[in-house]
Regions:
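A feature for loop-to-transmembrane-helix boundaries and adjacent hydrophobic helices
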Residues: 1-291
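Arg/Gly-rich low-complexity intrinsically disordered repeat tracts
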Residues: 293-304
């Protein structure tokens, strides 16, 4: 565990901040590459990224403050303190803020929401995988005690002071679990992108995969300051993950119903058109036979 990547005198380069910067750059690069394949302009991606990063950081902080409201209500001066700034934030807070911003952005720029989000979510998955490595180095988002041989023991006093991670105790490396999970999701999304049937499939797939993975991983988390609901039955992120899964189910049901109605309408329209064409052809054949009989009758008649 190395909270600081570089320390020279009084200068300290935080490992978490460094990994976050790498995640942002890697995410922008990936989004630009994917956007080119489907006709999304690179300049648009860069403009969007310059705004959404700030929005996501603010959203992550806001949800962090909400989940720890009992503390911040008693210490309101800490809301804008340097200590709060160093805490990072809650992923879903940043994601939801970015999502609402994206809805506004695509309306203003008059582009498809589904196409845009299909381009963006692989970058989100990759960025999360990289950022969680920074979490591991800083000691935040640590796991519960375990006897598993792959458990990790943290020993850095600075990390303990900053994040509260227990020292000298074997813990689940939940940061690495989530990093591996989101890296796998990233690979699935890259494979899926050129094979999708509809715009929005990749976006919805990401939401479902991450929500399911995050819901399960939360059971292994040991940090108690991430917020809970329903008398500690679910963490804040688990509750949001369930809402996301419910929302995705609703979208798929809506798509299935409306897709079936559209297919039925097309089928009925095709049947009607076929009947009209068939009737017209039958009429033409009948007229043709009538004309042929009349012609033969005229040929067989004798002049008086």
């Amino acid at each position: 565990m190395h909270p600081y990547l570089i320390s020279i005198g009084s200068f300290h380069l935080p490992t978490y901040g460094t990994m976050l910067a790498i995640a942002v750059l890697a995410g922008i690069y990936t989004a630009i590459r994917l956007g080119r394949r489907v006709g999304v302009d690179s300049a648009l991606i860069l403009d969007y990224s310059s705004w959404v990063i700030l929005v996501a950081l603010i959203g992550a902080k806001v949800l962090l403050i909400i989940t720890l409201w009992s503390y911040y209500r008693a210490h309101p001066e800490e809301i804008f303190s340097y200590a709060t700034l160093k805490l990072g934030g809650v992923f879903y807070g940043g994601f939801l803020a970015a999502l609402f911003f994206t809805i506004w952005y695509v309306r203003v720029r008059k582009i498809s929401f589904w196409k845009m989000t299909d381009v963006l979510v692989p970058s989100v998955a990759l960025g999360t995988a990289i950022t969680r490595l920074g979490c591991f180095s800083a000691g935040c988002d640590y796991g519960k005690p375990t006897t598993a041989p792959w458990g990790v023991i943290f020993s850095n006093a600075l990390a303990h002071e900053a994040t509260g991670v227990p020292l000298g105790v074997r813990l689940h490396p939940t940061q690495l679990y989530e990093s591996a999970t989101t890296l796998a999701i990233f690979a699935v999304l890259l494979w899926w992108s050129p094979r999708k049937k509809h715009d929005g499939d990749v976006f919805l797939g990401y939401l479902g995969l991450y929500a399911a993975g995050r819901f399960l991983l939360e059971y292994l988390r040991g940090d108690e300051n991430r917020g809970f609901v329903f008398h500690h039955l679910l963490s804040t992120s688990q509750f949001i993950a369930l809402l996301v899964l419910a929302g995705i189910s609703g979208v798929f049901i809506w798509r299935r119903v409306h897709g079936s109605e559209k297919a039925s309408a097309l089928s009925e329209g095709s049947s009607t058109e076929f009947s009209q064409v068939a009737g017209a052809n039958a009429g033409q054949r009948k007229n043709s036979r009538g004309n042929h009989k009349a012609k033969r009758k005229m040929q067989n008649s004798k002049p008086v």
